[in-house]
């Protein structure tokens, strides 16, 4: 083992972020290294660790992380030790790899990879990381695969980073592939139409491995998945067509009490329950029972440590954050916020919003709730769009569409934006709601303000 210290660990992590392209410091286009050759070699160097446990592979535009975490929580309830690999992280990159041990009390929460393990892994393979010219995501993928094997997990639920066909996670051969909802995002890398993006996601479908498709895919998108499944001789299940065995008796119960809040989780829940049906058929030894499974899914956030999805940060005033950042995700989120005002759940709405410069703001501006007070902000990443630019484009859009932009402000950093939102809520009185979102980076910088 290499000599470990907290100081050495922090220095090494900082150097890894600088040496290898990641979306924390460069654009997706710069960070994304398509192709599986590097990962195949790295995986072999690590001893093909993913072959030592069974896997579920998840791709999709939105809902991957929630689906992965619910599924892992349900599998752990069968008495299994389950790894979860998701991205991005919010506060600590070790959040990307977690283990839920169903043989322990659920109150213990998940285990994160230790700093010592990360340090030893990175120092041990330091020369290989440079030789193979890996991306940051490829490094963390290898780290997760190896850690799961060393910790002797029974199953691991693996989420793709971007796309599917050429994603570094696509070296695994899973028991089940899952594709969540499809939307327009990262079009410069994945394609400009839903069909093109679906084709990239369909790349995770392996020969003879069943696939569950979630969301409500348009016919042209469903056709892409059916065609690929046919080529791979894989059984395909559309979650919105079948009636999952636990849906009728347990879906309402789960949704009412689930700690992963947000109306969009109902669609993810249906995908998870359909996936559990398929897994139960493949592996009858899995004890997927009604109430036990329902309660495990209901407490997904606590059991798996999954955060940033319609998460309440404060109750005085109410503050909700969500990392949804593309038009498809924000359509759902903003509709739910409008619903709160329509039914008088809240008397006013204040939105702290920041966005990355590579997002198509023209597709998002029409979705903005018109009764909100807006506080535009700039998170600390070179990828961010400046708050002043968001404000200027919002003003222009409002002028062209007969809306007022008077209730909109600019804060150059997230902490100041949160402070202004709280002051504004106090001035409004009544029962205000603060929503923080638009980007993972905004949420990650806002969360410490409430801890």
For each predicted feature, which ranges?
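ATP-dependent carboxylate-amine ligase catalytic core
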Residues: 8, 30-36, 41-52, 77-172
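Nucleotide phosphate-binding/pyrophosphate-handling subdomain across enzymes
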Residues: 150, 155-160, 167-178, 182-186, ...
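C-terminal helical cap/extension that packs against the catalytic core
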Residues: 216-237, 246, 318-320, 327, ...
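Hydrophobic alpha-helical packing residues
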Residues: 71-80, 148, 394, 398
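Active-site-proximal loop/hinge segments that shape catalytic or ion-binding/gating pockets
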Residues: 439
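Short functional linear segments
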Residues: 1-60, 67-69, 73-78
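Membrane-proximal helix-turn-helix segments that form the acceptor-binding/catalytic region
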Residues: 198-206
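Extended acidic/charged loop-beta regions that coordinate divalent cations
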Residues: 88, 92, 143-189, 222-257
